[in-house]
């Protein structure tokens, strides 16, 4: 239902946020920015 949809949206947002944080961290570490 609506709650499941909201849960999925939140999970996807958290995933993409986590991915971008990881990407910026690894780029800083390897100095490829």
From Swiss-Prot:
InterPro entries: Antimicrobial_frog_2. Signal peptide: none annotated. GO terms for cellular component: extracellular region. It is found in: Secreted. Expressed by the skin glands. Belongs to the frog skin active peptide (FSAP) family. Brevinin subfamily. One of its GO terms (biological process) is defense response to Gram-negative bacterium. Disulfide bonds join 27-33. It comes from the Eukaryota. This is Brevinin-2JD.
């Amino acid at each position: 239902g609506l709650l499941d949809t909201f849960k999925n949206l939140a999970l996807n947002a958290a995933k993409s946020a986590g991915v971008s944080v990881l990407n910026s961290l690894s780029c800083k570490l390897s100095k490829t920015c």
